[in-house]
């Protein structure tokens, strides 16, 4: 994954946030980082949740004054060859989102129908409740301008599951930043355990209503 990402643009650098992965990911990335100054890693002792991992990565990038900050899965679910399209799109936007459901089309591979219906329905639900003008609010392939992340009080971000993606896009949108979607094909890994759980689903169900209320009361 790392060589494929670095090959897309000479200015790209990589940060891997490792939550104590049992498969040795942290040690592998450490070895790569030791010989490649464009590769970096944050080690966390245990799994603290998707949202806090992204926040840690955002803070790291902001401290080092990167102009653009990407987030993406590290298992080829997100195709690194699409990165140049994100870089082109961000010239006219503030946040670029990779959309699995652009204009109502479904571009997902290796998901059972139950998971697909849950995800697709969740995005319709989130759009209806919050008014967020995107087809795919829960996707994790994004590019942010630095000033977007700087404008958001990262300490106040409450979501830690997939609702985190909705919350970050909603906060950016409510601040007047331009969101732009580009279609992607999401290929789910065929090995490993899904991070989806009842707790994550419950968080997403209620968080969109909190976001709606915060938006109405100017608290985002």
Where are these regions (language model features)?
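A conserved acidic beta->alpha catalytic loop
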Residues: 18-27, 76
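Cell-envelope/extracellular polymer assembly enzymes that use nucleotide-activated donors
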Residues: 13, 167
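Short, well-formed alpha-helical segments that are part of the catalytic scaffolds
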Residues: 1-7
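Catalytic donor-sugar/metal-binding loop of nucleotide-sugar-dependent glycosyltransferases
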Residues: 132-133, 156-160, 169-185
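Short, conserved SAM-binding/catalytic segment
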Residues: 32-36
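C-terminal, non-catalytic tails of nucleotide-sugar-dependent glycosyltransferases
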Residues: 206-220
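Acceptor/aglycone-binding surface of glycosyltransferases and processive sugar-polymer synthases
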Residues: 38-40, 44-63, 68, 80-162, ...
């Amino acid at each position: 994954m790392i060589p494929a990402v670095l090959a897309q643009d000479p200015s790209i650098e990589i940060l891997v946030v490792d939550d104590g992965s049992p498969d040795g990911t942290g040690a592998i990335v450490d070895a790569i980082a030791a010989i490649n100054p464009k590769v970096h890693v944050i080690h966390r002792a245990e799994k603290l949740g998707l949202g806090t991992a992204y926040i840690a990565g955002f803070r790291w990038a902001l401290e080092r004054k990167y102009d653009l900050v990407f987030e993406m899965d590290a298992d080829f679910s997100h195709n690194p060859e699409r990165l140049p399209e994100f870089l082109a799109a961000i010239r006219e936007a503030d946040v670029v989102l990779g959309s699995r459901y652009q204009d109502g089309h479904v571009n997902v591979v290796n998901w059972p129908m139950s998971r697909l219906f849950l995800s697709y329905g969740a995005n319709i639900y989130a759009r209806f409740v919050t008014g967020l003008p995107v087809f795919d609010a829960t996707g994790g392939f994004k590019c942010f301008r630095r000033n977007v992340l700087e404008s958001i009080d990262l300490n106040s971000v409450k979501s830690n599951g997939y609702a985190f993606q909705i919350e970050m896009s909603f906060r950016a949108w409510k601040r007047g930043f331009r969101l732009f979607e580009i279609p992607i094909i999401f290929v789910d890994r065929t090995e490993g355990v899904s991070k989806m759980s009842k707790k994550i689903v419950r968080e997403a169900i209620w968080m969109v209503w909190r976001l709606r209320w915060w938006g109405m009361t100017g608290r985002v």
